[in-house]
Structures are given as structure tokens and as C-alpha cells.
């Protein structure tokens, strides 16, 4: 595999790939961000591309909901923030001249409501005992973040000394550790509970420690975050002027057949139920492995044992978001300007608008953001019940004003969405070494991209990075 450095990828975004000496017809499965990136680069390099998309829109998990909200209001059901070190995402935003604003990820006034006690982040940071977690004597007086970093920072410092070499050492050393098994070695149950609740790590307890280390590089450094003003879906939409004639919507891949010189994708139209076959020189599969499991691959041995195992075992985390529109920004009167509230109630994390702080009129908050098992409990409820329970939880923080100010709401569960069958990839212990090496590797005439085919899971950066990598790979073929 040709390894591209980050700077190489930035240059490819700016200047494109070299013009192909051997133009091909390429089928791209999925019009998510990685599919759009690879198709855009390959089309510009002289290839003929056809994008087959099962849903009725482009963007995949980059999804912004504008209904049922009032004019110009929306919430991002998928990605909602961009760390300032995600250079590939920011480079595409610059290329398309998309407007951005700062995403306020946390403030000292963030409300914490846990163990029946309501306080502010700045108060908790001065006196962590205020929340009455039953921590051990040697853990008293330390915040959840301080406890977590006391363990992770030495490992992160070691990685940063020589990332190319030291990541491998860390992967090998901690390959069998989940976050939970690692924390259990050092901390009391009370401290682990506090870390899980306040740092949103409960969902990651069963995940690979190495996965958490990759994530913590973003959150331990005081990263700034941005959002695309007007909705994150403006990024995938920016590819459409170039690619709209290349996308066929409602075409769901049911079967894939490889020959010596060609690959055929058999699709069923999601509205008419009609079957159509598309044949080309190569295919790039960008859909999640959770959905690829349902696709018949012929001949059977055209995919290696290791690829099939990765498709079967790769772990996906559920994610559910609930957005609520209110008549006014009553949370700002309570001192919450952007940032988030954290609670051990079912809603868990609420994020408040970073834009137009102090403005009058309606606004939408991301009233609940949950992952993994915490998202699954919401999946058991109807849309109406989700909104009802969200308002009940918010009223425990803000009082009855939430009922009088309520306008409308909507929710989105990525596990219940048939074209993703989960929110994002998160390795279980061992998967980084056992499965990942086989995920991005081509199988005959079939190549692979998507956030799961990168090591930057759950971020647009991972999808973009894999889209560039696969386009570069395909463009170099004879």
C-alpha cells in the first residue's frame, strides 16, 4: 500500500491527482464523504465514475436535519464539530469557501447534574468532592479529567516522542486491554464511574484502550473546534456541482460479482424495487462493514478470509441525537453560553448553540447525545416518547420553563438507519492488530474506503483521508 503523508494529502486536495495514463470506469458504492472525495479526485484525473447511493441524498452520515424546525434552524444529526488539527477537513472547507464559526465545546459555566447534585464545571474543578462519588482516599480532590490524564498522559507523551515507531509499541503492549480493564487496575469503582459519566467514557469502557488513546489526543490537548455555519451537510453538498450527473440515488447494492477484468454491482432500487446491474473496471466500496455484511460477494473466494472476518467482526457503536427547538435561549439566562451540560440522566450530554449568543428568538439545542448502550435505550422509544423524556430530563436541570418554551423536536438513531447500521467504528480490544491491516486492502478489482478504513474513526477527517488514499491507489493502477 502506498502510504501518503498528511502533507501529500493536502497537496492532492489543492492540486488533484496526476492525470491518468489509463482512464477507467469506476463504480463508487456510497455517496458519503469518502465516496464523494474519491469520485471527485478520480473524475478530475480523467476517469469515468458512477456513484451508486442507496438513500435519496448525498453525504452519508454527514447529515443535517432542518425539519421540523423554524426557518434557518437545524441540527447536525451526524458530525457537529471539527478539531483545529483536522487539516484535511479544513482544507476542503477552504477549497469550497464554506463559512465556519467556532464550536464552543466547553465553558467554565457548563452545568453538571449528577448523583442528584447540580453544579458548574468551574465549581467541580475547584472541589471535585461536591458530586459525592465514592472515590478512594488517594483519588480525592482530583477531577475526572485529572485522574484520566494521570494514566494516559505518560503513554501519550511516549507516543509523541516518535509516533511512527511508538504507536506500534503501544498497540502491541495494550492490545488486549479495554478501557475498563485498564482503569480497573488503577482506580476505584467510584473514580471509574465519575470518569465514565463526566468524560462521556461509559460508552467506551468495553472498547480498545488504543482506540481511546487515539481519541484522547484530540481531547487532552486544548483543541479549538469549528463548525460549518449553516450545517455540516454544506460540505458534501459542495461536491455536487461536479458530481451530480454521476450519482444514481436509491440504488442499494445487493450483490457483487468479480471477473478477471470486470466487476459487476447488482442493485435494487429502493423505491421501485427494480433490479439493475452495473459493470465497470473497478469498484470502490465506501459503505460501512455493518451494511456490507448483507451483500452477497461472488465468487466467494474473491474476498480473503481476513477481509470476511473483518466485515463480520468490526465493531460499530450506536449513536442517537435528539434536537429540540425552543422559543427563546432560556439556558443563556441561566449562564450557559454555548458549551454543554453533563448529566447522568438518560439524555447524558446536551450541547448549546455556539452562534448568535445573546440573540432573541427561537433556537435549537442538541438536547441529547448518547453513544453505545446509552443510545440503545432511546432506540426502544417512539419519536414522541423520545422528545417527552428529553423534556422531562431537561426540566430537572432548568425547571418548568422547558415546557412553556418548547416548540418542536426530532431525533435520529444511527443504529436504526438502514444505510449505516450504526454510528461509527470503534475497535474492541485486539481489533486494531487483528482486523485493521485487512480493512483497507483491495480484493481483486474491489477497493475500500470510509471512516472504518482509516484510523481516525467517527470523524469526517477519517472518511476524507481514506477517500484520498483510495483515489491515489486506483489512479496509479496500470
From Swiss-Prot:
Belongs to the flavin monoamine oxidase family. FIG1 subfamily. Pfam families: Amino_oxidase. It comes from Bacillus subtilis (strain 168). One of its GO terms (biological process) is amino acid catabolic process. It is an enzyme of class 1 (oxidoreductase). InterPro entries: Amino_oxidase (IPR002937), FAD/NAD-bd_sf (IPR036188), Flavin_amine_oxidase (IPR001613), Flavin_monoamine_oxidase (IPR050281). Its cofactor is FAD. The gene is yobN. One of its GO terms (molecular function) is L-amino-acid oxidase activity. The keyword Flavoprotein applies. The keyword Cell membrane does not apply. SUPFAM superfamilies: FAD-linked reductases, C-terminal domain, FAD/NAD(P)-binding domain. Substrate binds at residues 81, 369. It catalyses: an L-alpha-amino acid + O2 + H2O = a 2-oxocarboxylate + H2O2 + NH4(+). Its EC number is 1.4.3.2. It comes from the Bacteria. Keywords: FAD, Flavoprotein, Oxidoreductase. This is Putative L-amino-acid oxidase YobN. FAD binds at residues 34, 53, 61, 80-81, 451, 460-463. PANTHER family: AMINE OXIDASE, FLAVIN MONOAMINE OXIDASE.
